[in-house]
């Protein structure tokens, strides 16, 4: 059974990643109304008779979201049953399921009633939490933390602050990026790093949205760079922290490069999807560091109780 659960966890993680990228594809191609205003049917039909490209994209996104719902539910039930001895299992299972349902309902509401771009931008963030929760659940199932000897992890308050702070801030950056997509502001500023050679400062809403995201992205790049330097200097003996920040910096660098290429490739589809891919992976890595950070007090308590028993 455990082998089956491991396969299920991997397939579920991949399915949720496809859901995230599929949502970005729907937004990028303007396929949100590919099935009209009907849900769960498509243009009022179970199998649509008129298949335009927008319909195919929207319908595919709905099907992958539906399969993800089934897989996440099954994974939550089995992990709850067979891995309940791991303290984070129940919390992650609940988060995975609740946020997946929330993003599905929000997606349906957007189709039927429509939503403001500011509200639609939350949709990607909700999906991202579900994805990260499933990734962490998968890590627990594969006992990744034991391979890194996470029980002996030592971390000072400064490093924990950076882990929690960057993770929370990354979610804000994700929202600003999603807002850029939903406001159709990807090409509002045709130059980089300033908005335009003729007008370096933004003058209207779409330009402010675009430049706001750029500033937020530059700040997270600098923050992760600083945290990585700290990890390299002081955490070489803690591989999970050391490599966690190095991987995070690689991902945020790729994210930044692709973000610039989005501007200079006229917001090509490939760059837009890579932009969503890298931020999804980065958020998952940061959430894993958060999970380990929450264990520090537990590890300390366990060590304290053990020493008392020894005395």
Curated annotation (Swiss-Prot):
Subunit (UniProt): Interacts with CtaB.
Superkingdom of the source species: Bacteria
PANTHER family according to UniProt: HEME A SYNTHASE
Name of protein: Heme A synthase
Family: Belongs to the COX15/CtaA family. Type 1 subfamily.
Chain's gene name: ctaA
UniProt GO cellular component terms: plasma membrane
Pathway: Porphyrin-containing compound metabolism; heme A biosynthesis; heme A from heme O: step 1/1
Disulphide-bridged cysteine pairs: 35-42, 189-195
Listed InterPro entries: COX15/CtaA_fam, COX15/CtaA_HemeA_synthase, HemeA_Synthase_type1
Task performed by this protein: Catalyzes the conversion of heme O to heme A by two successive hydroxylations of the methyl group at C8. The first hydroxylation forms heme I, the second hydroxylation results in an unstable dihydroxymethyl group, which spontaneously dehydrates, resulting in the formyl group of heme A.
Provenance organism: Bacillus cereus (strain G9842)
Sequence ranges on the Extracellular membrane side: 28-62, 113-121, 181-211, 265-271
Location of the protein in the cell: Cell membrane
